[in-house]
């Protein structure tokens, strides 16, 4: 869902071919509770709410009329971004909203399963790039007010989060590909051309190469869009009580204009002072991003330990929103990614797209059930923990809590872990079984071995203290 240039190119190539280190000692390592993001020469620091780095895992819920058409978000609108059977002209796409009727919508059922699986926070899609609002907004002309009799899909979700005990988070795209204020030549200007081919800003020159309009006229367009965005923010951030997280997506607007990014961020923090914001409210022409933490790792793994507070987001079923009964990665994969991210001080945002009728696929509950079994014995190793010295002083990922090191055996073939710079332990045990694990000193190193009686399971964790 991230609309950055490199991701766009990589994703396009893939889809055409097939388908958005820290120094020791440990006390000085993560968790660093300052956001750190560098673009060009600008670094943005801001204190983040302490719950977020401790939380570890979030549930992303992208949903909307696109789910009816079994297409990913609004990307089917672009004829050059999808194969012919996945391309939806504007009129056909907008007609999906008349068929979007989640009569079996029961968010509490989703969230109970998610809570048991270890998820701590959420990001419910309020509006994606197609501009469809999931609540009866007074701003804009595409949403439940026009197509669902004014039904509010947001309030039941918020109330269910609070009953279940999950942090309330929203995902919102200020970009609106279908925004069509009176007097403009076509919908979606200037992020597309009249044939709805995807175009992007030429940031390096500060000029919008995709629009044959002067900057003042373009500025007028964005001022009108800003009024809609601000109005919608005023609704969702005052109607539903305390909101813990706002996950921006797609604020990728052209250079050379004021797209109100800083004003938007300031306005949100005025309405919700304790809210956590990601870094996708972008100010490309000013050489920096805003927000509290980095979301640089979308559907890809970091090659080295990222700096500061960060989150990886991933569509484990192949696409963000519902695209039919596509295969999903197994629970063991989700647990492994969570463990690796936590060992480097990051969070993991996992995406599952609900069906258009409001139900979740059975595979969602299967994955959550398997994760819940693992969480019952090993959840302490991934929540409210610090990053460990991996790979500097351990050959397996390590998380730390107090005086305990949690060793994550992620490969079924690895039966021993080697640690350096650690005192001889007083206790070494397998979390899943409670059995003692053997250890020995070897040339100033400590080698911890899994008991032979312990079969290889997903992320076998050994606690060393």
Q: Model segments located where?
A:
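N-terminal secretory signal peptides
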Residues: 1-8, 20
